[in-house]
C-alpha cells in the first residue's frame, strides 16, 4: 500500500492527470454523443461530428488533422505528430459514427443526450466508439501535461514505455 511519504509512480501520476479531467471527459462525451452521426443516413451530422473531432484532436496537439475521401462515404480523419527521436510511432484508432439501428426500441432516454444512471453514462455510440475517442483525447492531454514534468536524461520520453501503457 502507498503511504503519504511514498513517491507516486509514473502510472500513478498519469492516473491523477486523467482523474483531474473527469469534468472535461464527461463534457467531451456529452458533445460526441450529441451528434446523431448515423453512418450512411445523416451526412450533415457526420460532417458536424468530424469537424468536432478534428478540432478536439488539433487542440491536444495532433498535427494536420484532416478528412480523407473514403469509398464508403464515411468521413475518416487522419492526423500525425512526429515522435521524439528514438521513440516509437503509436497508432490510435476509433470512429465517430454509429451504425443504423432502425429506430430499435429500448431507450428510455434520448439516445443523443448523455444520461447518467447509477454511476454509468449512457448515450448512442458511447461504447462504440465515441467513448474510446474521448479516452484517446484524455490520454493525449494527460501525456502532454505529465510527460514534460517527468523527463530524465536516461528516459528522453519521460520514461513512458509500452509496459506502462499496458499496465495502465
Question: What do the predicted segments below correspond to?
Answer:
Residues 4-126, 142-160:
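Acidic/His- and Gly-rich active-site-bordering loop/insert found
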Residues 114, 132-140:
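DPxDG-like acidic metal-binding loop motif
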